[in-house]
Regions:
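Core alpha/beta catalytic barrel or barrel-like domain that forms the active/cofactor pocket
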Residues: 1-10, 25-44, 61-82
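Active-site cavity-forming subdomains of large catalytic enzyme subunits
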Residues: 10, 15-21
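Flexible, glycine-rich loop/tail regions that form catalytic "lids" or insertion modules at the edges
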Residues: 48-49, 53, 57-60, 64-184
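Glycine-rich, charged/polar anion/phosphate-binding loops
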Residues: 19-23, 123-125
Length: 184
């Protein structure tokens, strides 16, 4: 399970720590086998070392301080969780039927189904935010403090980009294009 990077915001990035923590806890409560927690500053660029450490500490706190590991299925029997699961299953079956109707996943890709679906969902999300139907703390509500820089950004020297471009150029010149095309 990976926490939902799309839910992170550029505004008030420290709030992303809370977003990542509750998403991680939800994954653990749902019985995930492995967990990746996004860093609070990933919407701004590559994560800083301190942000990565906070993401790691989030996992460690959940693992060692919450007691969640003491039971196999802590949400078993919850009517609310069962109703959410039933709704998710119903929604998933509708999507599966749509994709099957297109001729399968590959045809869906060729027909632009997935890109279109993601774009439409993103548009709806934005419309809901603008209308105030969906509150995103720090973005369309509780915005005081947005003018303050809250986190440092990772600064990568220009020389690193130059070196990587040179390495790529050398690689591209030395590779066998026929073998590359065959491999693809």
């Amino acid at each position: 399970v990976q926490t939902a990077g799309y839910s992170l915001t550029e505004q008030q990035p420290l709030n992303n720590i809370v977003r990542v923590a509750y998403q991680a806890m939800a994954g653990v409560l749902g019985g995930c086998q492995s967990l990746h927690t996004d860093s609070m500053d990933e919407t701004l660029g590559l994560p800083t070392e301190s942000a990565v450490r906070v993401a790691l500490r989030t996992q460690q706190i959940i693992a060692h301080e919450t007691g969640v590991h003491r039971t196999v299925d802590p949400l078993a029997g919850s009517y609310y969780v069962e109703s959410l699961t039933d709704q998710m299953e119903s929604d998933a079956n509708i999507l599966i039927d749509e994709i099957d109707g297109l001729g399968g996943v590959v045809q869906g890709i060729h027909k632009g189904y997935f890109r279109r679906s993601i774009a439409e969902a993103s548009y709806r999300f934005g419309q809901e935010m603008e209308a105030g139907d969906r509150i995103v703390v720090g973005v369309n509500a509780y915005r005081a403090g947005n003018e303050d820089a809250q986190v440092d950004l990772l600064q990568i020297p220009h020389s690193v980009e130059t070196i990587q471009c040179e390495r790529l150029e050398t690689f591209l010149k030395s590779r066998d294009d026929d073998k590359a095309m065959l491999a693809l």
